[in-house]
Amino acid sequence: MENRPRQQTSGHDCSLGTGDDLSSRPGRVDLLRAHISPTTVKQVSVNHERKVVGSSSSRSAVWGISPDGSNAFESKNFGLEGDSNHTVEHEVIKEEDSQKKSPFSCGSAPRVVDSPGASVVSREGRVGPPSDGSAVVSGDDETDANNSEDGTEDEIVSEEGRRTEDEGDVTSRSDQVPCTPPPMWVPEVLSDESEETPLRRVGEERHVSDSSSGGDGYLRGTRQGRVRPHAVPPLFHTPSHFTPVRATSSRLISLSSDSERMHRMAQKVQTQPEMKPKELDKEAERKQEQLRSSKGDNKGIFKGLLRQLTRGYTGVAHLFDGLASDFKPHTENEGSSSNDVLTEERTVQPSSAVVSDKRVTGNGTGVERFKPRVRHRLSQECRPSFPEKPDEETSLSTTLPTKLKSLFSFASSHWNHASPGEGEATEAAGASVSGSSSFLAANANHSPSMLDAYGRPPQKRTQRRSFFGSVAAAASNAFAEAGAVAAAAAEAVAAVGQSSSDSSGDSSSESDHSGRERSRAFRGKRGGSNEITTMRSQRSAGHLSFSREPERESDQGEMTPTGETSGSESELDQVILTEHATPFNFVLWATREAAASLQRPLLSGPPEEEAGNAEELRSTENAIHRRELQRLGRLRAVALRLLLLICEDDSWCQDGTTRQSAHKGANDGARRRFPPIVQGVRGRRRSDRDTESPPTEATQDSEEVDRLWSQWINGSPETEGGEDADRKQEEKRLQGRGVSRSRYMWKAANRMLSVDRRLRKLHSDTAVRRMGETEFWKLYFYQVFLLMNRFDRQAHKVLRSLSCSFTLTTGEGGDENQPQEVAHDVLSQTSGFTESDTSSPSPSYGFASSPCTSARLIIPPTGLPDNTEEGEPLSFGGVSLEPKDEEAPEQVRQDGLGALAYAIFSSSRSPSLSSSSSGTTSVSARGTGSSFSRDVGESPLLVPRDSHRSGVGSETYSAGGDSPALREKVISENAGCLPLGRAPSQPTNTVSSVSSNRAYLEPASRRGSFSVVPVSGRRLRDALFAKRVSSSSQVNGRVSTSRGTMGEDRHQDQQGDNRLEGPSHLSAHNSLYQLGSRSGNCVQIKVKELKELDGTCGDTHQPGLACKGKEVQGARA
């Protein structure tokens, strides 16, 4: 039998089923030769591959062991010796497998041996079609491969039925398994292995052996499970086999005759998995789901190698894909389904396969994943959320880059530290982050103690789940939502700035209400939990897999519209509560609610009730606190969303050094020490600033803060430039390597967290009161400044663009979208509330102007220029802003805070902000190119053209993550905002733009330009007023085409040398917006763009405010 099968098989190998004894030897020799030298004979290699595939698939494929490489090599080595035995065994196994997927009695082998041709045919039929027919070739090579691999693979396979089936010949290796026992254990092994392997292992094996053994593993896997989930090709597979050739010829040979057998085998194999232990089955299924969700879609396109190469992006892409396909807790696993993510997940949890269920079922990912109820609480409370936080942390490990994971993990560690008392505040913050209104409603409906006691109605969970589904459906909307959130965050920031002064009593009552919470929050716990909650929210927004959190939060908000926060809240809640509610809907609601809340007197302080019943006062305080938390939560959510969006590209956030430094110094310090705002800001700022350098002493930080503050106020970035200049150079050096970018992205993430913490403290207003608002805002803006600097110079072009883009959002850009418009109003209110001399008109004006001029530096001055001079173009340009800051640093802080928050958060989603409502954000991206394009434009990634190509609107950003196009797009969107503020300043600071190109922190040069721009400033002012008129149109116009046009024209006219303004800038804008009028004077371009854009939000800044062509013209006038 041995000889006959060998002869037949080898003959079959050579003749593809002829059964030549003579050809068996030559075929084998050829096969060996083919293995040894793949280029030998395609036919022979095909035959050999078929053989190898057959044996390998029958043995290793079943066991999920990829015998590909070993099979090939060993068949080379042993092909001649054990060929017939293994071939017979293989044939028998194949035959039996095809006949029965269960183990076979020894007789099976003889059967197959007796009819080697048939067995080969069946092997071909079974193997050929799925495994490219490689195994169809006679069993000789397969036997060879089996022999060589038999000892290892069969033993590993626990001598599946094949070995046992294998006559004594195979028994030499499969001696361990007697002929009779195989039927008993083989079925179980087959069932376990078949189900697990076919689903997961088999898929991998099959994929591996398919690529490595030319379908051998595939054949085997096909027989067993027919399931070919993104199998991972063995590392060693390809060298010895021609998978394509094998697959093609073998498949052709074996498809016709053996397809039926193969189908039967697959069916039988599918039947066997039932026998598999449920544990293994579940684990395999989980793994399969993970792999399928993450890799399954790409199994055909992305092989294991591609997956590995694109693992970071694939994880994110799969997160979205999985969410889109079906939003499940497994989405996290899906996100982590990529091997690396799975490994990380495994690291987090004992078994990656179980991870998904653990997350889903709350088996506990490193931290107990309590029940969904706990999860629900988590979103609502700090305590519960800390347990959930680990769960989410695990999810992050699966879906997020290592750095983000570490970021979340350190945040989660603080969550873990959060105490129940803190939990209330944390919960409030977390709820406010996503569903602040829900938190308000919860607080209104339930006492904080109830909340602390996890009194959240479980029904909200159900709504949340439905919201999960809606979020999955709204994956694309999540990014637009981020834009809306940015607007809401701007409003929240404005409210915070407003409440910082107004809510001192507010905070006091709030502090009274949650004195313990506040004290703990000051320690950073509440802030940490909020921050984490926000991070989760952002994560969910940025990574749809986490949409669950924002969904939960939004659902809470939707479900609990009863909060005092706003009447519109209930309306929006009704909208959001709908099954189809999307994060974007929630963002819109939150924005609206935030705007309504801002208008409410509670922000000013508790109502008269405060004077009345202590209970009422407490209730009022709680309401105030909730509203503040809502705003801050939204702001944090935007910041975190921005962070996640930036970090969606894993490289941005994956810097172990940065991660550690940020985690050890800034985060804990910010949370633990009361000046956490100061120390945390400084420490984080420090660590963020210099990843390598540990957080410096608070004194040094204070000095630096003071210095930077004075620089901000004075508008001289020299010192700052000096400090960051070295860093900038270093970053530039590293940026090419991608180190600085990831490092700075991580820093930015930490800084965002720090800002969140600061905002929380500001929210409680305790820190502000203790520090004094000036000090507080100094620190806050210093941090923001560092963040902006980091991004303007070193890090993300998107962030740079975001820095400017907030001006658009802050300015009239908000008007375009209702949320934005509300934000604009809020900003104006904030300016007024904030002690800004100029109230709404100036603040918008100033906001738009300063960010464009210098997103970083001008942020604090943003409010000042309004105060400084609405009528003086120069001040508008941003010079006045900084001087105004000097004059009224507190006011500047107020406006600056709103503007800064706008800049940071709205910039984070500036495109989304505009696109959320107008969807014309992508044009805005162009504006960023102008304002930040100084640097960004310089950088090829940020070239406006690319931004245009990358796509318009936040969708590109959401899609692109870190892709240059996306960054460019975001930048362009942001630029859309900048050009207005910047366009006015650009004509003035044509040179200043250039200097900005040299250093983003050159408000002074911009100021100089501003001095040059008196007319432009006036134009901008005119445009601002016009813009405000056309803010609504501005959303579309917000695209910053106007910015590009106006800025371009000004740049070209005054700053022809400016890269933005240069022909490339012009052409970039044209290519990006393809607005014919871009090339020439700004007026034409701007007007046309504005018309095209229906109001250039990019001009939102000032010209941007004049989204209308008339506005632009007025600005130009």
Swiss-Prot record:
GO terms for cellular component: cytoplasmic vesicle; rhoptry membrane. Keywords: Cytoplasmic vesicle, Membrane. The keyword Membrane applies. Its main location: membrane. Residues 1-27, 47-243, 258-301, 325-398, 415-442, 490-572, 600-619, 654-736, 829-848, 858-891, 909-964, 1031-1066, 1095-1117 are annotated as: Disordered. Residues 1-12, 530-540, 557-569, 829-838, 1031-1044 have a biased composition (Polar residues). It comes from the Eukaryota. Residues 83-100, 197-209, 275-300, 510-520, 546-555, 724-734, 1046-1062, 1108-1117 have a biased composition (Basic and acidic residues). Residues 418-442, 490-508, 839-848, 909-931 have a biased composition (Low complexity). The keyword Membrane applies. This is Rhoptry apical surface protein 3. It comes from Toxoplasma gondii (strain ATCC 50853 / GT1). The gene is RASP3.
